[in-house]
UniProtKB/Swiss-Prot annotation:
Induction: The mdtABC operon is transcriptionally activated by BaeR.
Molecular function, one GO term: efflux transmembrane transporter activity
Known partners and oligomeric status: Part of a tripartite efflux system composed of MdtA, MdtB and MdtC.
Keyword set includes Membrane: yes
Membrane disposition: Peripheral membrane protein
Keywords: Cell inner membrane, Cell membrane, Membrane, Signal, Transport
Name of the featured protein: Multidrug resistance protein MdtA
Organism: Escherichia coli O7:K1 (strain IAI39 / ExPEC)
Any single GO CC term annotated in Swiss-Prot or TrEMBL for this entry: plasma membrane
HAMAP family: MdtA (MF_01422)
Length: 415
């Protein structure tokens, strides 16, 4: 019994061991099968494995532009402020009560237009008095002259002494002097009356009124009645570095007016175009700049006094210049360079000499020719002689459309 019992346990143990061995054998085969595709894929991707490993990687995508030949203007730029050609504070020349205002705030007026009236009563009275005194003295003079004529006849017969004749002559001369004084008084009174009507001294735009009708005003008031700014034409005062003076003077010697453009604060919109008026006669030693004044017609009222603008003055135009986008110009240890594409879309580095430059384009004086293709984007991935793929610039709209399409595709896959 004991022998048969031991035999059964031996059989059970052998079966368990066989089952465990079979399980490990089956698990090992599954692992080798799942590892085989990965190994194959690695072999395909390995540079030394299979035909696919012998193929080159994808070409670097770049954007390119063609160098063109064109006329390029040269501008000098500066910051400036619009100033009125003339600014006049309209004040009363006489004292009195303000009776009427004949303008609308902000309107354009012409020189001589009536702006305000002061009560003329006192000035009319003064004029009448002066005219009356003049008439009286004229009558006195006429009588004195008649007496003088009689004295001149009587002195011949010794009925009147020579002394009396001289006295009468002096009286006539004195009265003539009084007449001149009276005439001046009349003119002064008339002037005072005229000044009670206040007119515009210059063409321009009136500002806000400084006094209301009914107030007593005087010639000593500093605030005045209203301020007129002449805006047709209007001036731009800006500064240039002293190093640009020679360029401006040389351009002026050509005999043509230099064009000055006024751009808005963000330098994105041209407001108006005028001409150079003058340079200041001295340099500001503190800033090393010189003041420049330009004049604009401003019939469209695009410019306003005290407005901040960016000024651009055209001083020269470079003809037949080779121009490329500014993004293509790079700077290295050897100097400025660009990447040039040949007919096989292989790139090579060309050292260049840049000229006039702005945020959009740059003139190349030496190093490339018109018609050469230069890389403008994807430059950081380039090496000498590398072959690249030239792609078109992708607009923001296109990017948004593609992103939207991908989002719809994801939603469709989830649904």
């Amino acid at each position: 019994m004991k022998g048969s019992y031991k035999s059964r346990w031996v059989i059970v143990i052998v079966v368990v061991i066989a089952a465990i061995a079979a399980f490990w054998f089956w698990q090992g085969r599954n692992d080798s099968r799942s590892a085989a595709p990965g190994a194959t894929k690695q072999a395909q991707q390995s540079p030394a494995g299979g035909r696919r490993g012998m193929r080159a990687g994808p070409l670097a995508p770049v954007q390119a532009a063609t160098a063109v030949e064109q006329a390029v203007p040269r501008y000098l730029t500066g910051l400036g402020t619009i100033t009125a050609a003339n600014t006049v504070t309209v004040r009363s020349r006489v004292d009195g009560q303000l009776m009427a205002l004949h303008f609308q705030e902000g309107q354009q007026v012409k020189a001589g237009d009536l702006l305000a009236e002061i009560d003329p009563s006192q000035f009319k009275v003064a004029l009448a008095q002066a005219q009356g005194q003049l008439a009286k003295d004229k009558a006195t003079l006429a009588n004195a002259r008649r007496d003088l004529a009689r004295y001149q006849q009587l002195v011949k017969t010794n009925l009147v002494s020579r002394q009396e004749l001289d006295a009468q002559q002096a009286l006539v001369s004195e009265t003539e002097g009084t007449i001149k004084a009276d005439e001046a008084s009349v003119a002064s009174a008339q002037l005072q009356l005229d000044w009670s009507r206040i007119t515009a001294p210059v063409d321009g735009r009136v500002g806000l009124k400084q006094v209301d009708v009914g107030n007593q005003i005087s010639s000593g008031d500093t605030t005045g009645i209203v301020v007129i700014t002449q805006t047709h034409p209007i001036d731009l005062l800006f500064t240039l570095p002293e190093s640009d003076i020679a360029t401006v003077v040389q351009a002026q010697k050509a005999g043509k007016p230099l064009v000055v453009e006024a751009w808005d604060r963000t330098n994105s919109k041209k407001l108006s175009e005028g001409t150079l008026l003058s340079l200041d006669n001295q340099i500001d030693a503190t800033t090393g700049t010189i003041k420049v004044k330009a004049r604009f017609n401003n019939q469209d009222d695009a410019l306003f006094p005290n407005q901040f603008v960016n000024a651009r003055m055209l001083v020269d135009t470079e003809q037949n210049a080779v121009v490329i986008p500014t993004a293509a110009l790079q700077m290295g240890n050897e100097g400025h360079f660009v990447w040039v594409l040949n007919s096989e879309n292989k790139v090579s580095k060309h050292l260049v000499t840049p000229g006039i430059q702005d945020s959009q384009k740059v003139v190349i004086r030496a190093g490339i020719s018109a018609g050469d293709r230069v890389v403008t984007d994807g430059i950081d991935r380039l090496t000498e002689g590398a072959k690249v793929e030239v792609v078109e610039a992708q607009s923001a709209t296109t990017s948004e459309e593609k992103a939207t399409s991908r989002e719809y595709a994801k939603k469709g896959a989830r649904s």
